[in-house]
């Protein structure tokens, strides 16, 4: 009888421990925000709605892609939306979102102008003819953010334009979309910088004449 009672007590204890373990197991879909509150994303994992609903969006460096739609996207059906307030670029196939990626637009004194543009030029390996680095005759950098239009090149020195690979020109006065350092705030000289891991793919999906909306 005592043995039966002991087995029952052990079984009850194990059951209680299992219940406690289940009750305390964290929800993998839940995220603790900075204010201490727990956020549970209401949208299915992997969907664009889920990506945008995350607390770290839009500041995240993460990129969302619809792989199936990406395979169907080419220069005949693509367009880009640049959102200045969120600092995000959206590659679209018609009205459907193909990719959402971080961008970096112009600073307050050199803002990226909103508007609807057509790509005027595409160049894979381009350098700026205005912004870059100034070197002295010994090859030392004397100005890491030089403006060739206003800064004087020292005797024997040189100006080297900043690289702007996978360049897509939007205006003839120097605004374009290209690879560059992506801060999570406006930091460029009016151009729209994009990540090196993203821009070659975006570039491949666009052509001269494709639409880019900056809003």
Give the label of every model feature segment:
Residues 2-14, 18-215:
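N-terminal pre-domains immediately preceding structured catalytic cores
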